[in-house]
């Protein structure tokens, strides 16, 4: 399929009834080729470049597959194998989940006329979309992270959150809930075992209530145990 512009002009020149010397016609066509933009002279290269660009954009929609595989292998025994289709399925699920939560958090920011999505926006979006069971454990991790990063000055006398051997949360009714030591930073990992497994965490004792309301009905005395990266033994 021919492009417009100079191609149409060349047809009129070649089909002209007035004869022209062969040398003059050849020189004219060569000059015409030099006048065209480089992309017209190399259509195949342009087409391939466009396909590569589309491919890159498609890949940018997903979390890198190497990261997905690394996360999957943390929970699997050493001898386990992962098929390619399962890797791609998890990759698409994780990427879709990130987009789902981020989009909801972004809508909240737009309503409040803010440009920066905060961790609180993400937790709010997760709660609104029905992922309530993740809120309280992730909130604890967030407090731990911020304290160790020095972003918040937390003291025991202030009352809201304090750190001793673990993370202690004071609830509105005055009860205290202690969460076990989280290990060194930056190695804040999710639990790697399925012992009383709930949403990536391992609980001993009563499982904590994950609602954002702060109720202590199910959370009193619960401990979140975070293990280093280890392998299962079947």
Swiss-Prot record:
Biased composition (Low complexity): 213-222
Keywords noted in UniProt: Abscisic acid signaling pathway, Activator, DNA-binding, Nucleus, Transcription, Transcription regulation
GO biological process assignments: abscisic acid-activated signaling pathway; positive regulation of DNA-templated transcription; regulation of DNA-templated transcription; response to water deprivation
Effect of gene knockout: Altered response to abscisic acid (ABA).
Keyword Electron transport: no
Region (Disordered): 1-21, 35-55, 206-234
Listed InterPro entries: CBFA_NFYB_domain, Histone-fold, Transc_fact_NFYB/HAP3, Transcrpt_fac_NFYB/HAP3_CS
Induction: Enhanced by dehydration stress.
DNA-binding residue intervals: 63-69
Subcellular location: Nucleus
A GO molecular function held by the record: sequence-specific DNA binding
Record-linked Pfam families: CBFD_NFYB_HMF (PF00808)
Gene3D superfamilies tied to this protein: Histone, subunit A
Tissue: Expressed in roots, flowers and developing siliques. Present in etiolated seedlings.
SUPFAM superfamilies assigned: Histone-fold
GO CC, alphabetical: CCAAT-binding factor complex
Location of the region described as Subunit association domain (SAD) in the Swiss-Prot/TrEMBL record: 90-101
PROSITE patterns documented for this protein: NFYB_HAP3 (PS00685)
Family named by the database record: Belongs to the NFYB/HAP3 subunit family.
Subunit and interaction comment: Heterotrimeric transcription factor composed of three components, NF-YA, NF-YB and NF-YC. NF-YB and NF-YC must interact and dimerize for NF-YA association and DNA binding. Interacts with PRN1. Binds directly with DPB3-1.
Role played: Component of the NF-Y/HAP transcription factor complex. The NF-Y complex stimulates the transcription of various genes by recognizing and binding to a CCAAT motif in promoters. Plays a role in the regulation of the embryogenesis. Involved in the abscisic acid (ABA) signaling pathway.
Protein name from the UniProt record: Nuclear transcription factor Y subunit B-6
Name of the gene encoding the protein in the UniProt record: NFYB6
């Amino acid at each position: 399929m021919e492009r417009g512009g100079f191609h149409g002009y060349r047809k009129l020149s070649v089909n002209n009834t007035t004869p022209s010397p062969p040398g003059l016609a050849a020189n004219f066509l060569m000059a015409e080729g030099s006048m065209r933009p480089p992309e017209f002279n190399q259509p195949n290269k342009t087409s391939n470049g466009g396909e590569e660009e589309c491919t890159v954009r498609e890949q940018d929609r997903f979390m890198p597959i190497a990261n997905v595989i690394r996360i999957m292998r943390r929970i699997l025994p050493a001898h386990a194998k992962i098929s390619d289709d399962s890797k791609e399925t998890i990759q698409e699920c994780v990427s879709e989940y990130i987009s789902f939560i981020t989009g909801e958090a972004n809508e909240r920011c737009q309503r409040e006329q803010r440009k920066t999505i905060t961790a609180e926006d993400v937790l709010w979006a997760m709660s609104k979309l029905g992922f309530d069971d993740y809120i309280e454990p992730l909130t604890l991790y967030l407090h731990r992270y911020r304290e160790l990063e020095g972003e918040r000055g937390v003291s025991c006398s202030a009352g809201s959150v304090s750190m001793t051997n673990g993370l202690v949360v004071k609830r509105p009714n005055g009860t205290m809930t202690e969460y076990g030591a989280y290990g060194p930073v930056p190695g804040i990992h999710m639990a790697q075992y399925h012992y009383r497994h709930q949403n990536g965490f391992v609980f001993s004792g009563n499982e904590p209530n994950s609602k954002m309301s702060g109720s202590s009905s199910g959370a009193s005395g619960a401990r979140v145990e975070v293990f280093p990266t280890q392998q299962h033994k079947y």
